């Protein structure tokens, strides 16, 4: 029994079960095209008037169309299943995308925080490096200043030691000169020189008196005495005696003058040496106080400055030398 073709404009049976999708849309479009072709063929046959002989052909064509429709429905179901699976996978991928995007945002935030932290660390390291460089420069400057101060102190110490050695040598010379033995010897020499000069003076006086007596003895009476005196004065003996007397007198005067000058020079030298001894004693006392203060300051500043023991030793020697003259005097 042949089925009647459906009216135009009506959808075939089961078309309401078609789902939207790429494969279902292609199957639905193919089935609709075939049905429209059949309807066009029926209209053409109706117009021609030869519809009955073509019924079986139409039935066969309708069966083919139904089989194609069934096959398309199956393919559509499979496509719908694939579509659903793909849709689920798409949802999962979207969820994964959202999750990964959230992770990416957190990672980017962490990266930004780490970059800021790294920048802070770099700035801190640069600041510490600059501070370290400044500290090194300051330390080098202070070391140079310390070296300069040490050089100055060394130079001052050497100058002081040299000056102190000079004072000590002068003090020793003065001490040697002012020793009781030396002074006694000098006084003995002066006394002996004085006694020798006095003896020579007395001898010259005796010689002068002898010459006068001889002259008086040679005079005689008044008339003959003048003649004899004139003859004697004109004689070679009188000239030799006068010349000898003048020479002896001149030598005695020169010797007395030299002895007086030497005595005066010795007195002046003794006075100068006494003044010099007093001045050296005062300087030694003053330098002794300075050396003691300097040694105390060196002990206080020994954390960054080395103190030399030489000034202390020199101070001790100076104190001993000061004690010696005081004990001898």
Curated annotation (Swiss-Prot):
Where is it located?
Nucleus; Chromosome
Q: Which InterPro entries does the record associate with it?
A: SYCE1
Chaperone in keyword set: no
Quaternary organization: Homodimer. Found in a complex with SYCP1 and SYCE2. Interacts with SYCP1, SYCE2 and SYCE3. Interacts with SIX6OS1.
Q: Which residues form a coiled coil?
A: 54-167, 194-294
Q: Which domain of life is it from?
A: Eukaryota
Task: Report the PANTHER family cross-referenced here.
Answer: SYNAPTONEMAL COMPLEX CENTRAL ELEMENT PROTEIN 1, SYNAPTONEMAL COMPLEX CENTRAL ELEMENT PROTEIN 1-LIKE
According to the record, the residues making up region (Disordered) are 1-29, 291-329
Q: What is this protein called?
A: Synaptonemal complex central element protein 1
Entry's family note: Belongs to the SYCE family.
